[in-house]
């Protein structure tokens, strides 16, 4: 949640640079479609089985900002999985995804509450697909990596007392890395002290990536989403 959490520093020089370190964890569900070669797995997580699909993700980030510019670097790790079978158990399918995302973001303040963002995001993905029909089982695995540019907006508004609400959205890909990537974060932050804050929020990362042909063909049209909580230290 790093790039979406500027602080108000009315008493400080507008040109003075401030630093923050963030750590947060999130539960993440996954849905969409994944295909490797001719093996395709549709992932559809309903409300009833959402928590069966939840696995763990974590992020660390560093942000430096003044009242005009901000620069953020963050690393996110996600381990996601899903599986389903027919009622009679004659067929089943599953998907496991291990993903590292490294994102660098530059921000320019447009108004006291609104920031324009430009990011470069590197995705490193390991996917494992399993399909079983009766006693015949097929499993395929592939690795993929790509870089996406993104543009976005970040809106931050105090909501009383020590609380702040934030909404950030980014869109990118544009056929450079993926066909389409989009990213959304919404958070509520409580500033306990001048140097310590904690967060509750919800995050979505989605991409449509396609590469290769024949047995080496890969297509991932996936959405990863879930609640998260984190802490931040300012200095």
What are these regions (language model features)?
Residues 34, 183-235:
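Predominantly the C-terminal beta-signal and adjacent terminal strand-loop region
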Residues 164-179:
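Transmembrane beta-strand segments that form the barrel wall of outer-membrane beta-barrel proteins
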Residues 21-27, 73-77, 118-122, 167-171, ...:
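Transmembrane beta-barrel strands of outer-membrane/channel proteins
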Residues 15-17, 54-58, 65, 96-102, ...:
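Residues that define the transmembrane beta-barrel architecture of outer-membrane proteins
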Residues 32-49, 81-97, 125-143, 210-220:
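Flexible, solvent-exposed loop segments that connect beta-strands
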Residues 21, 60-66, 104-108, 118-120, ...:
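Residues on the lipid-exposed face of transmembrane beta-strands in outer-membrane beta-barrel proteins
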Residues 68-71, 113-116, 161-165, 194-198:
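Repeated loop/turn-to-beta-strand initiation elements of outer-membrane beta-barrel proteins
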Residues 10-81, 228, 234:
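Short glycine/proline- and aromatic-enriched beta-strand/turn motifs that initiate or cap beta-hairpins
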């Amino acid at each position: 949640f790093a790039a979406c959490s500027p602080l108000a520093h009315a008493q400080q020089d507008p040109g003075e640079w401030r630093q923050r370190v963030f750590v947060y964890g999130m539960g993440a569900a996954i849905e969409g479609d994944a295909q490797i070669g001719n093996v395709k797995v549709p992932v559809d997580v309903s409300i009833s089985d959402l928590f069966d699909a939840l696995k763990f993700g974590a992020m660390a980030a560093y942000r430096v900002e003044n009242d005009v510019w901000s620069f953020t670097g963050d690393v996110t790790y996600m381990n996601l999985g899903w599986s389903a079978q027919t009622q009679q158990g004659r067929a089943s399918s599953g998907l496991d995804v291990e993903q590292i995302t490294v994102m660098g973001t530059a921000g320019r303040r447009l108004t006291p509450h609104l920031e324009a963002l430009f990011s470069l995001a590197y995705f490193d993905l390991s996917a494992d697909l399993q399909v079983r029909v009766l006693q015949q089982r097929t499993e395929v695995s592939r690795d993929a990596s790509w870089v996406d540019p993104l543009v976005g907006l970040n809106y931050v508004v105090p909501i009383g007392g020590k609380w702040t609400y934030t909404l950030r959205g980014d869109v990118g890909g544009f056929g450079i890395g993926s066909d389409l990537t989009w990213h959304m974060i919404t958070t509520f932050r409580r500033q306990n002290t001048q140097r310590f804050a904690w967060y509750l929020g919800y995050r979505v990362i989605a991409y449509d990536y396609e590469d290769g042909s024949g047995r080496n063909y890969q297509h991932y049209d996936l959405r990863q989403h879930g609640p998260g909580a984190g802490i931040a230290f300012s200095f």
